[in-house]
Amino acid sequence: MIQVESRLTVCDNSGAKEALCIRVLGGTGRRYASVGDVIVVSVKSVIPSSDVKKGAVSKALIVRTKKEIRRPDGSYIRFDDNACVLLNNAGEIRGSRIFGPVARELRATNMKVVSLAPEVL
């Protein structure tokens, strides 16, 4: 459950470490985003000598949330942190690696996040 001003961990090797949600995409008055949703973020901290600069505005795909997700079979899944991966202008993942597990719900997004992730829960 990500909203404007939420801070997320960036879990790919694009060079960003932390990002701030500045817009939830998908409707005029939409307040919250969950796993599989695309948001607009501002990069808040980066590793040295990365191609992503601090303050850069980018789109991001949410891959983990602390708020639990209800599955159709009635089970729930939640993660320890809120995490995202940065996207380029074409909507593809900017990095080439993903760190940490991702939710199975990302299969519906038709992105290569699931194939890059070390574990899918």
From Swiss-Prot:
Q: Which GO terms describe its molecular function?
A: large ribosomal subunit rRNA binding; structural constituent of ribosome
Name the family.
Belongs to the universal ribosomal protein uL14 family.
User: In its UniProt record, which GO terms are filed under biological process?
Assistant: translation
Q: Which organism is it from?
A: Bacteroides thetaiotaomicron (strain ATCC 29148 / DSM 2079 / JCM 5827 / CCUG 10774 / NCTC 10582 / VPI-5482 / E50)
Whether Ribosomal protein counts among this entry's keywords is yes
Q: Gene3D superfamilies this protein is in?
A: Ribosomal protein L14
Looking at the UniProt record for this protein, which Gene Ontology cellular component terms does it annotate, in alphabetical order? cytosolic large ribosomal subunit
* Keyword line: Ribonucleoprotein, Ribosomal protein, RNA-binding, rRNA-binding
Q: What does this protein do?
A: Binds to 23S rRNA. Forms part of two intersubunit bridges in the 70S ribosome.
Q: Which InterPro entries match?
A: Ribosomal_uL14, Ribosomal_uL14_bac-type, Ribosomal_uL14_CS, Ribosomal_uL14_sf
What CDD domains would the database entry show? Ribosomal_uL14
Pfam families, sorted: Ribosomal_L14 (PF00238)
Tell me the protein's name: Large ribosomal subunit protein uL14
What is its quaternary makeup? Part of the 50S ribosomal subunit. Forms a cluster with proteins L3 and L19. In the 70S ribosome, L14 and L19 interact and together make contacts with the 16S rRNA in bridges B5 and B8.
